[in-house]
Amino acid sequence: MTTNIVVKLQFEALHNWPGVVNMLPDQPWIHMLKDKHRHIFYITLEKGVTHSDRDVEIILFKQSVVSHLETRFGRPGDLGALSCEMLAEYLLREYNCESAEVLEDNENGA
């Protein structure tokens, strides 16, 4: 049996998609994504544990993720051209997680 801990957090940050005009030239209404814009990123991480007696303390794990994001990207964050997919992949690698979900404004994402 596999057991995971789950943490959920929110991270306010800016990002942009510089390549949107070239990628979607026939969709001018979405070209505004080339400029920095703000989101609340809703992040959910699942991390595997080896036993059920606080192998990884959930509160400390969440605090470490929040602290890392603020140190790496600032507060509010500036993610540059990172997409939800890229941020999810980054967090998967950084924390050796089983899964990562990153949603813009708790609506759409990866």
What are these regions (language model features)?
Residues 1-110:
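Charge-rich, low-complexity N-terminal segments
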